[in-house]
C-alpha cells in the first residue's frame, strides 16, 4: 500500500472510521498475493471476488471490523499481526461452506474472547446469527485468574460445548485449530518442543491432549481436506508424546 500503510492493521481512530476503509481492488490483490507468497495462507477463496452481493458485503464488513478490533495485537512469540490468524481461519472456512454468515463469523471468531468488544457490540452490527456463532467460539477467560491455572477447565468446557454444537460452529473451530497448528508446525520445525514455553500451558502432554481431543470431537468433519491436514500436523508435532485420556 502507498506510504507503507496497512489498510487493515494501521488504522487511526479505527472505532469511528473502520466503515470508511475501502482499499482499491489492486491494493487488495497485492495484499492477498503477499499472504500466499509468504506461506501465511493458501489460495484466497473465490467468494471474495467483486460481485456486490449482500453476503460479500457482510464478509467485507467482518474483515474490517476484525482488523480494527485486533489492531496492535500480535501472535504469541512473534511479530506477525494477530489479524493474520482470523483471516486465515476465514479462508479455511470459505473452503468448507458457501454460507457467508459462517465465513464472516470465522473472521470475527476471536473478537469477543480477545478484544474489548462484546456480543452486544457485534449484535448491533452483524445480527443474531453471526454473533451467536462467534459467541459459540468464545471461552470464559475467568478474568482476574491466572490463565495457566484456568487453562484445563477452559479447554474442557470448550470441548464439551463443541461436541453438540451446530456443524457451522464445528467448521469454525476446525479452521481455527488448523490455523493455530500451521503456526505451531512452523515454529516446531525450528525450535522443537521448546515452542510451548511461550504458551499459557507449557506442558507438551496437555497440549497434545487438547489438540487430539479436538480431532476426536470433530471427527464428523473427517471428509474435509482441512481435517486431514489437521491429523497430519498432529502427527508431526506430537509424535511419541504420551497423552492423557481424551475427551470422549
Which positions does each model-derived feature cover?
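Active-site helical microenvironments for divalent-metal-assisted chemistry
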Residues: 5-6, 10-248
Amino acid at each position: 500500500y502507498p506510504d507503507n500503510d496497512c489498510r487493515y492493521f494501521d488504522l487511526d481512530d479505527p472505532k469511528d472510521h473502520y466503515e470508511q476503509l475501502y482499499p482499491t481492488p489492486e491494493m487488495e490483490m497485492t495484499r492477498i498475493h503477499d499472504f500466499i507468497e509468504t506461506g501465511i495462507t493458501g489460495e484466497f477463496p473465490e467468494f471474495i471476488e467483486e460481485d456486490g452481493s449482500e453476503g460479500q458485503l457482510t464478509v467485507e464488513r467482518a474483515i474490517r471490523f476484525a482488523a480494527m478490533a485486533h489492531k496492535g495485537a500480535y501472535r504469541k512469540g512473534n511479530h506477525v499481526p494477530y489479524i493474520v490468524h482470523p483471516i486465515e481461519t476465514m479462508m479455511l472456512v470459505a473452503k468448507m461452506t458457501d454460507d457467508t454468515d459462517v465465513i464472516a463469523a470465522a473472521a470475527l471468531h476471536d473478537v469477543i474472547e480477545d478484544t474489548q468488544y462484546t456480543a452486544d457490540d457485534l449484535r448491533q452490527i452483524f445480527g443474531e446469527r453471526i454473533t451467536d456463532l462467534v459467541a459459540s467460539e468464545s471461552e470464559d477467560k475467568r478474568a482476574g485468574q491466572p490463565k495457566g491455572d484456568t487453562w484445563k477447565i477452559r479447554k474442557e468446557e470448550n470441548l464439551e460445548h463443541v461436541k453438540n454444537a451446530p456443524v457451522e460452529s464445528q467448521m469454525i473451530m476446525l479452521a481455527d485449530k488448523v490455523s493455530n497448528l500451521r503456526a505451531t508446525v512452523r515454529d516446531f520445525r525450528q525450535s522443537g518442543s521448546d515452542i510451548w514455553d511461550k504458551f499459557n500451558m507449557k506442558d507438551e502432554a496437555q497440549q497434545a491432549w487438547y489438540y487430539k481431543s479436538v480431532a476426536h470431537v470433530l471427527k464428523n468433519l473427517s471428509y474435509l481436506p482441512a481435517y486431514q491436514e489437521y491429523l497430519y500436523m498432529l502427527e508431526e508435532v506430537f509424535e511419541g508424546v504420551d497423552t492423557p485420556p481424551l475427551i470422549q
